[in-house]
Curated annotation (Swiss-Prot):
Superkingdom of the source species: Eukaryota
Needed cofactors: Mn(2+)
Outcome reported for the amino acid change (mutating Y282G): Reduction in N-acetylglucosamine binding
Gene: B4GALT1
Annotated protein name in UniProt: Beta-1,4-galactosyltransferase 1
Pathological condition linked to this protein in its record: Congenital disorder of glycosylation 2D: A multisystem disorder caused by a defect in glycoprotein biosynthesis and characterized by under-glycosylated serum glycoproteins. Congenital disorders of glycosylation result in a wide variety of clinical features, such as defects in the nervous system development, psychomotor retardation, dysmorphic features, hypotonia, coagulation disorders, and immunodeficiency. The broad spectrum of features reflects the critical role of N-glycoproteins during embryonic development, differentiation, and maintenance of cell functions.
Stretches assigned to the Cytoplasmic side: 1-24
GO CC terms of this entry: azurophil granule membrane; basolateral plasma membrane; brush border membrane; desmosome; external side of plasma membrane; extracellular exosome; extracellular space; filopodium
Reactions this protein catalyses: D-glucose + UDP-alpha-D-galactose = lactose + UDP + H(+); an N-acetyl-beta-D-glucosaminyl derivative + UDP-alpha-D-galactose = a beta-D-galactosyl-(1->4)-N-acetyl-beta-D-glucosaminyl derivative + UDP + H(+); N-acetyl-D-glucosamine + UDP-alpha-D-galactose = beta-D-galactosyl-(1->4)-N-acetyl-D-glucosamine + UDP + H(+); a beta-D-GlcNAc-(1->3)-beta-D-Gal-(1->4)-beta-D-Glc-(1<->1)-Cer(d18:1(4E)) + UDP-alpha-D-galactose = a neolactoside nLc4Cer(d18:1(4E)) + UDP + H(+)
């Protein structure tokens, strides 16, 4: 019998070769799937980072270092030729608690302040927390008031301060979200000096801060404490501030270790003014510059609204704090030194003849005179490169 010849190459061998190619393809697909899964895992399950990990350019990267496109590590998105979003806190809607006028963002300033906006808050979470004591502090400073101040130049010297006077550290997350409230009327030259000196100090202190100048409209008698209440209410409409520094416009610290932030107890900052021979005039003194946390401020029902004219409201505030079981913390007299810009008494800010009687009744009046009785009307909001000015009608003495 003739034996059948074994199968040689030809059509009968094709099924084995096809199977081999199919197996190779399956292995390649599995390897690709495993690679994509690994990259996805390394990206922290954030698909937006996949192009960076695999070396593909994105519109923000532009084929170069991504830090340059997002303002290095500043947490600010440079928008290039695109029309920028509104500055921080800007809105075309009426401001709550005010009139129907829209919020207006205007004022001169460098273009860099107009073409950059903060990145989403989630980006800041990747930054480390700022240290308890800033390494940028320099200590004692020479404070002089004998040179003119140009606010456009001040803005250029502080390029990281954003429209409306907002700033946050570039390379760490500050635990101190501070609104600085300045009661104001007809003190433009003093405000220039304040902005010139304080913006660098506040940045070296690594604060997340905003500057609010609360301008009393009209020529009725001045009411400092009521303007501070207004500043508290209005600042919270912009940002989740947790600390409030209340500062007269004519006081400048002489040492940047004097922290413009809040502590476990209410803080008196201007403890050694040149006006008083660099000493505390009396133990209960709480005037000039002070800081209260949001909770501390709410606990005392804010500040009194019925102190029209000069004097008395600081002592009323001190009484409120004591009646709520709080004590005053202060820096030492060396760190707490401040200089006052000399000036004559403002018109419509004469001494309040009722102040001593009102101070004597703080315990009875603090429950009904404060945030819960505050009335005012916002007339205008202007956001300048170095500060936000809110002009308000706070009424007249009843």
């Amino acid at each position: 019998m003739r034996l059948r010849e074994p199968l040689l190459s030809g059509s009968a061998a094709m099924p084995g070769a096809s199977l081999q190619r199919a197996c190779r393809l399956l292995v390649a697909v599995c390897a690709l799937h495993l690679g994509v899964t690994l990259v996805y895992y390394l990206a922290g399950r954030d698909l937006s980072r996949l192009p960076q990990l695999v070396g593909v350019s994105t519109p923000l990267q532009g084929g170069s270092n991504s830090a340059a496109a997002i303002g290095q590590s500043s947490g600010e998105l440079r928008t290039g030729g695109a029309r920028p979003p509104p500055p921080l806190g800007a809105s075309s809607q009426p401001r709550p608690g005010g009139d129907s006028s829209p919020v207006v963002d205007s004022g001169p300033g460098p273009a860099s302040n107009l073409t950059s906006v903060p990145v989403p808050h989630t980006t800041a979470l990747s930054l480390p927390a700022c240290p308890e004591e800033s390494p940028l502090l320099v200590g004692p400073m020479l404070i002089e008031f004998n040179m003119p101040v140009d606010l456009e130049l001040v803005a250029k010297q502080n390029p990281n301060v954003k429209m409306g006077g907002r700033y946050a550290p570039r390379d760490c997350v500050s635990p101190h979200k501070v609104a600085i409230i300045i009661p104001f009327r007809n003190r433009q030259e003093h405000l220039k000096y304040w902005l010139y000196y304080l913006h660098p100090v506040l940045q070296r202190q690594q604060l997340d801060y905003g500057i609010y100048v609360i301008n009393q409209a009209g020529d009725t008698i001045f009411n400092r404490a009521k303007l501070l209440n207004v500043g508290f209410q209005e600042a919270l409409k912009d940002y989740d501030y947790t600390c409030f520094v209340f500062s007269d416009v004519d006081l400048i610290p002489m040492n940047d270790h004097n922290a413009y932030r809040c502590f476990s107890q209410p803080r008196h900052i201007s403890v050694a003014m040149d006006k008083f021979g660099f000493s505390l005039p009396y133990v209960q003194y709480f005037g000039g510059v002070s800081a209260l946390s949001k909770q501390q401020f709410l606990t005392i029902n804010g500040f009194p609204n019925n102190y029209w004219g000069w004097g008395g409201e600081d002592d009323d505030i001190f009484n409120r704090l004591v009646f709520r079981g709080m004590s005053i913390s202060r820096p030492n007299a060396v760190v707490g030194r401040c200089r006052m810009i000399r000036h004559s008494r403002d018109k419509k800010n004469e001494p309040n003849p009722q102040r001593f009687d009102r101070i004597a009744h703080t315990k009875e009046t603090m429950l009904s005179d404060g945030l819960n009785s505050l009335t005012y009307q916002v007339l205008d909001v202007q956001r300048y490169p170095l500060y936000t000015q809110i002009t308000v009608d706070i009424g007249t003495p009843s």
